[in-house]
Design a protein with these regions (language model features):
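GST-like domain detector, emphasizing the conserved glutathione-binding G-site
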Residues: 1-97
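Serine-centered coil/turn micro-motif
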Residues: 10, 60, 128, 154, ...
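Non-transmembrane alpha-helical segments in soluble domains
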Residues: 43, 47, 67-70, 111, ...
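Short, hydrophobic secondary-structure boundary micro-motifs
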Residues: 53-58, 93, 123, 150-151, ...
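A short, terminal or domain-edge coil/loop segment
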Residues: 55-68, 109-118, 136-144, 173-185
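GST-like fold's C-terminal all-alpha helical module
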Residues: 73-161
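Long hydrophobic alpha-helical segments typical of transmembrane helices together
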Residues: 151-185
Length: 185
């Protein structure tokens, strides 16, 4: 019925998050069943709590398609986070350019793949887990300024605009200070 969002410092050795999730990664979702970690596990649980077949199709090819998009989006996020960490944790001049290039290549190829899919957001439907993940990932790329995806993937700009203007409450989830984009107005 209710979700409390608790900010955590993943680098803090004695954090509550590390007590709940031995990996110390985010997100961690605490339920009556205990702590759940990994976005995919959490999505499965939320879908089940909501009665199923809402965030993830129940079975068959549609489910596989959604799960494949989720895996691609997770991979883009992993690459983006590694780029952010390389810049944040290594002093300037000690960053490994080949690592940055390799991760940017993953993002570039993956966005080109999504661009080729000619995705369109159906304004009348409830978003599935891949839709939500795609929106969050695109806004994360903007927020961290990891990759200029808007120029590389113009159809995703259109998709994002349709998503953000159709999904109730999405704009309220955006972090402060994120650059102005058409869907944030």
């Amino acid at each position: 019925d209710q979700v409390d969002i608790i900010a955590t410092n993943t680098a803090e050795p004695d954090s509550e998050n590390r007590r709940l999730n031995p990996l110390g990664k985010i997100p961690t979702f605490v339920t009556d069943e205990g702590p759940l970690f990994d976005s995919r596990v959490i999505l499965e649980a939320i879908d089940r709590f909501a009665g199923g077949d809402r965030l993830l199709p129940a079975a068959g090819p549609k489910r596989t398609t959604v799960q494949t998009r989720i895996a691609l989006i997770d991979g883009i996020m992993d690459a983006a986070i590694l780029i952010v960490y390389e810049g944040r944790l290594r002093p300037e001049g000690m960053q490994v350019q080949s690592v940055l290039d390799y991760q940017r290549g993953k993002i570039e190829r993956s966005l080109a793949y999504l661009e080729d899919q000619a995705l369109q957001y159906d304004k009348g439907k409830n978003p599935d887990a891949a839709d939500i993940g795609l929106a969050c990932m695109l806004d994360y790329l903007d927020f961290r300024q990891v990759f200029d995806w808007q120029e590389a993937a113009p159809s995703l700009v259109s998709w994002m605009t349709d998503f953000a203007t159709s999904v109730s409450g999405y704009k309220e989830t955006l972090p402060e200070g994120i650059a102005a984009a058409p869907w944030r107005r």
